[in-house]
Amino acid sequence: MNLKRLPISFFVLLCLSSLSVLAQNDKPATATNDEKAEKIIQSVIEAIGGSTYLNVRSVIGRGLFTVYKDGQSGIPSTFVDYIVYPDRERTEFKGQEGKIIQTNTGDTGWLYDGASKSLKDMTKMQVEDFKRSIRSSVDYLLRGEWRKEGAKLSYVGRREAGLAKRNETVRLIYPDGYTVEFEFGAKDYLPMKILYKRKNADGEELAEEDRMAQHVKIEGVTVPFVIDHYTTSAQTSRINYQSIQFNSPIADTLFARPASIKAVK
């Protein structure tokens, strides 16, 4: 369920080792803006499932992941994504070059590359990327985890979202300056966009955007089945879910680092 986040494995495939930075636009929030933003959050929670959504503790998603370059789509890879809240995730990819597995658990993680037959611990930067992906997720916003970090919530206003459509926009600013904006349909309150900025390996500031579509209700929870990622207005990837399961048992062993390459399953 990508309300949680775009799995950081997708960003590894795109070679996005980066540092997120403060977005600089729009006016500062006021107390009134905060109240408006809080009401929007409550409306979104109700729209996507209310208590049923809030009671989701684990997610298993299956589908296709496609990289885009210069406006052209590549050959899709199949994926299985396992999430256990609040901070465990394992994503498995199968493509032309073999299998890739990336697993994160809090402050640790490991990566298996079937093509090169390598099994490595994640670098500190990769772990930090994973943590930032959580902080920029709709789930982190709706479940109120940002409050524990002392982030500031504000109402930005309405934005154009196509013919006769508008999105309500709220913003989170974390104490370290990391800024994320979330757009929700003004009529149905479904998640539509996530916007933030990052710096690439060359120190260049890039605008990132996740666009959500094809919302489907499953087991009482409404989720987007398509998530398109854009960098500086150019599409770089698409996630297309084929199935999503909530609260199915997920073994702890899935997240444990294998003792050797031969032990990878």
Task: Describe the role of every protein-language-model region.
Residues 1-5, 24:
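Positively charged n-region of N-terminal signal peptides that target proteins for export
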Residues 9-18:
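Bacterial N-terminal signal peptides
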Residues 23, 98, 161-261:
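Gly/Pro-enriched, hydrophobic low-complexity segments
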Residues 25-39, 46, 108-178, 186, ...:
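Flexible, processing/modification-adjacent segments and terminal tails
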Residues 39-118, 149-158:
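N-terminal mature ectodomain segment of secretory-pathway/periplasmic proteins
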Residues 76-79, 102-106, 120-128, 183-184, ...:
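Short amphipathic beta-strand/extended segments with alternating polar/hydrophobic composition
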Residues 85-91, 110-113, 130-134, 192, ...:
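Short, surface-exposed linear segments at secondary-structure transitions and domain or protein termini
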